[in-house]
């Protein structure tokens, strides 16, 4: 019911796409180790929400971590061998450790097929023809089990191989892949390897967010969304003025460099201690600037 209330809010302010970011909070088959003790969304709940959103002209887009930010899944006995850092599942939980050190080991032959199986199971619940594979903040890549391969081929080559493989696989199914652009900022020239038809989600959350990242990827031919934030995460109260300035700046960059959309973000890094409804002002700023970018 809470998610339906959000859908009503988005509809009221002409927000026509919505992504629910998932790491482990869906009831995946054969992954009860990851969601046990939590309250994961079920297939029935997601399909009901998808229908509810479509009735309000909102496209509900699946968003699933498929490279970095896989703490709960890669900490299970079943999947810990797929984690970049050996024995990371034995380290006591902390929000910082969970967020920074659970990257998929792409040198493992099982890794890509495992991710494809999760995407296949999850994507079937949505009517959207888009899929956000995320692939952001792969902090550990090349530093553990894949170090030998990274030393041979280069860390960025490992990153690109995984992203390109998933993108081509989705495109072959007539699905538009989306991914976060933070790793590409460091190597914008490598964007030529990304297949045509992929959407890059270019984020930046500062009040006076610079245009460089949006400009550089635009010059490389990227099709992109600009992605500001509501500035509520990791705090008790929202930074409302920061969100206003951030949304204004990112919308300006998007208009200047011909972005095709805006995705406003509300994260739960270090625990979402801020009340969810405190995000509403930032959500509305994004809607206002997106529809009135000039």
Give residue spans per PLM region.
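Glycine-rich, histidine-containing beta strand-loop boundary motifs that form or position
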Residues: 19-24, 62-66, 135, 181, ...
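Substrate-binding groove of N-acetylhexosamine-processing glycoside hydrolases
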Residues: 48-51, 57, 109-131, 137, ...
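N-terminal structural segment of carbohydrate-active enzymes
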Residues: 1-19
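Sparse, context-dependent recognition of short Cys/His-centered cofactor- or disulfide-binding micro-motifs
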Residues: 3, 26, 31, 64, ...
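Aromatic- and acidic-residue-enriched carbohydrate-binding clefts of CAZyme catalytic domains
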Residues: 11-12, 19-59, 69-113, 124, ...
């Amino acid at each position: 019911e809470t998610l339906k209330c959000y859908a009503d809010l988005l509809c009221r302010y002409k927000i026509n796409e919505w992504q629910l970011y998932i790491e482990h909070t869906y009831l995946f088959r054969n992954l009860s180790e990851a969601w046990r003790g939590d309250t994961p969304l079920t297939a029935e709940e997601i399909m009901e929400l998808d229908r509810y959103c479509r009735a309000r002209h909102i496209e509900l887009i699946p968003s699933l971590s498929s490279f970095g930010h896989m703490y709960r899944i890669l900490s299970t006995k079943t999947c810990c061998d797929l984690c970049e850092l050996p024995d990371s599942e034995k380290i006591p939980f902390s929000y910082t450790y969970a967020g920074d050190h659970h990257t998929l080991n792409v040198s493992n032959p099982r890794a890509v097929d495992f991710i494809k199986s999760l995407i296949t199971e999850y994507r079937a619940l949505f009517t959207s023809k888009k899929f956000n594979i995320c692939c952001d903040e792969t902090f550990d890549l090349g530093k553990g089990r894949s170090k030998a391969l990274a030393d041979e081929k280069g860390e960025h080559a490992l990153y690109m191989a995984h992203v390109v493989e998933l993108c081509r696989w989705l495109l072959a199914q007539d699905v538009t892949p989306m991914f976060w652009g933070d790793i590409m900022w460091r190597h914008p020239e490598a964007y030529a390897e990304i297949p045509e038809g992929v959407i890059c989600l270019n984020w930046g959350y500062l009040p006076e967010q610079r245009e460089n990242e949006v400009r550089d990827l635009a010059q490389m031919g990227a099709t992109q969304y600009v992605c500001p934030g509501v500035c509520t995460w990791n705090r008790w109260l929202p930074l409302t003025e920061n969100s206003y300035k951030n949304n204004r700046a990112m919308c300006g960059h998007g208009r200047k460099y011909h972005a095709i959309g805006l995705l406003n973000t509300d994260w739960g890094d270090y625990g979402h201690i801020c009340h969810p409804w405190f995000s509403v002002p930032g959500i509305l700023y994004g809607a206002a600037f997106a529809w009135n970018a000039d």
